[in-house]
Amino acid sequence: MFRYEAKVFKELVDSVSKILDEGLFIITGEGLRLRGMDPARVALVDIEIPSSSFFDFYMAGDVERVELGVNMETLKGVVARAKKGDQLEVRVREDKVLFIVESVVLRRYLLPNLEVIVDVPEDISLEFDATATVIADVVKKTLRDVELVGDIVEFDAGEDYLSIRSVGPERRRVETRLTRESPALIDLEVKEPATSRYDVGYLKRMLGVAKIAESIELSFSTDKPLKMVFKSPDGSRVTYLLAPSTG
């Protein structure tokens, strides 16, 4: 079915397992895709890995679509020890899925192919007033700083700046402000100024994906959902939608 870099797959699974209890991977000739929402329906994750990103990728015979349903915590355990250079091979056999981790030793895991129901709108159309592309490591470190101060992070964008900040009790405050001259701010497009607040905990759940992404695209409007797009050098793409905080 396919062979992929085990370490990269591990980072994806680690993050997604904090959002979804079960995942349904859809495999077609174009590649692999997983979409799902958390039980509270606050966050949506969408993973797309094109067939060209795999070491090996094939569809058997005239099969056009294969569904792979799995418990995310179980899958997390399968790839838990994956290191850089390891490879993951996946073979789907109707009601079973064989995972082979090729490392110093060869590890095989045979798991049931679960029937997973995905209740996610097929097409979510959103327009955003502000879109900023930022170096991934800067976003990751900024959110970790924010967590030290409060539970809510505020994104604020103007014509020539992006601010990520939080205000906590006892006048604690932290802010990362990027301008168009900042090396970390790759691109900034602002139709009109926008400010919106989000739960830090939900954002932290996807920080693992930042390890495999060079940049993160942040899109938002005032009091509207936040869209984060993580782009990997191999062509993989992770989109994360998060509802604004009402607190």
Curated annotation (Swiss-Prot):
UniProt KW DNA-binding keyword: yes
Superkingdom of origin: Archaea
Molecular functions (GO terms): DNA binding; DNA polymerase processivity factor activity
SUPFAM superfamilies named in the record: DNA clamp (SSF55979)
Keywords tagged on the record: DNA replication, DNA-binding
GO biological process, alphabetically ordered: leading strand elongation; regulation of DNA replication
Pfam families: PCNA_C, PCNA_N
Family: Belongs to the PCNA family.
Assembly: Heterotrimer. The subunits circularize to form a toroid; DNA passes through its center. Replication factor C (RFC) is required to load the toroid on the DNA.
Functional note: Sliding clamp subunit that acts as a moving platform for DNA processing. Responsible for tethering the catalytic subunit of DNA polymerase and other proteins to DNA during high-speed replication.
Full protein name: DNA polymerase sliding clamp 1
Organism: Aeropyrum pernix (strain ATCC 700893 / DSM 11879 / JCM 9820 / NBRC 100138 / K1)
Gene transcribed to yield this protein: pcn1
